[in-house]
Amino acid sequence: DPQVPXYFIFGDSLYDNG
């Protein structure tokens, strides 16, 4: 997922919109 401030979840990075 793109590293953009969207939803703060444990994904590819701290900021993950997916």
UniProtKB/Swiss-Prot annotation:
Tissue expr: Seed.
Catalytic activities: a carboxylic ester + H2O = an alcohol + a carboxylate + H(+)
Superkingdom per UniProt: Eukaryota
Function: Implicated in the breakdown of oil body-stored lipids during post-germination.
Organism for this UniProt entry: Helianthus annuus
Name of protein: Seed fatty acyl-ester hydrolase
Keyword Hydrolase set for record: yes
Sample GO molecular function, one term: carboxylesterase activity
Keywords assigned by UniProt, alphabetized: Hydrolase, Lipid degradation, Lipid metabolism
